[in-house]
Design a protein with these regions (language model features):
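Rossmann-like NAD(P)-binding element
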Residues: 53-55, 59-93, 97-102
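Rossmann-fold NAD(P)-binding glycine/threonine-rich loop
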Residues: 98-144
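General beta-strand structural signal in soluble alpha/beta enzymes
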Residues: 58, 125-131, 176-180
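A glycine-biased structural micro-motif
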Residues: 8, 66, 91, 123-126
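Structural/interface elements that position substrates and couple domains in central-metabolism enzymes
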Residues: 35, 105-108, 174
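NAD(P)+-binding Rossmann beta1-loop-alpha1 motif at the extreme N-terminus of oxidoreductases
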Residues: 2-47, 51
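Active-site-lining helix/loop region of Rossmann-like oxidoreductase modules
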Residues: 22, 148-207
Length: 207
């Protein structure tokens, strides 16, 4: 995604359940503005957003998808509904925070769940990330005992991965790139009754 040096990327979180709110707290902690949206009227969760911080902006789904970087924090089964919000996701980065709980490998066509999501968001650049942390951990300050909580990232697009790597750093995490979706994506995915080797691992890196 090419942006001028003076243009700051805009961010949105789609989904405002436990994971969406945990992500919002990470943004609020650093004073970074982020839009939050669900399929509901934003008034219905405005008070919850305000309680997290002044940089958390409740909005409609139609407005939220105008952002440059979109965190997908909905149930895996709901990702096609979000994908239909735009005819093309060209120029946007989608951060896939979903986990395909209970979805059989057969239903995924034998593919990593992140690749299935990537195919739904036509034209977009997908980065798998932050999904390996449960909400109760993700919402905590990533500064831990003098170290930083690890955020695993996987993507087939090096530019998108680099941008989310920088964002993760700004949010206080220690990002670790795991490679492409077929390799790294498998390490951090939960699908059906199987679990990737790194899923739900809460690791801290000391520089």
């Amino acid at each position: 995604m090419s942006k001028s040096k003076n243009k700051v990327a805009s961010y949105a979180i789609i989904g405002f359940g436990n994971i969406g709110q945990a992500l919002a707290k990470a943004f609020a902690r650093k004073g970074i503005e982020v839009s939050v949206a669900t399929t509901r009227d934003p008034e219905s969760f405005a008070s919850a957003a305000a309680a997290i911080g002044p940089t958390i902006i409740p909005t409609t789904l139609a407005e939220a998808v105008k952002a440059d970087v979109i965190f997908l924090a909905v149930r895996f089964e709901s990702h096609p509904d979000v994908a239909r919000a735009l005819p093309t996701w060209q120029g946007k980065i989608i951060v896939d925070v979903t986990n395909a709980y209970g979805v059989s490998p057969e239903k995924l066509g034998g593919q990593p769940s992140s690749r299935v999501v990537a195919q739904a968001f036509t034209g977009g650049k997908l980065v798998k990330g932050f999904n390996h942390l449960v909400a109760a951990v993700l919402e905590q300050d990533p500064a831990v005992r003098g170290g930083r909580r690890v955020a695993f990232l996987a993507s087939d697009d090096d530019g998108a991965a680099a941008e989310i790597d920088a964002l993760a750093e700004n949010l206080g995490f220690s990002p670790i790139k795991l490679g492409g979706l077929s390799e790294g994506g498998l390490l951090v995915q939960a699908r059906g009754n199987s679990w990737g080797q790194l899923i739900f691992n809460d690791l801290v890196k000391f520089d």
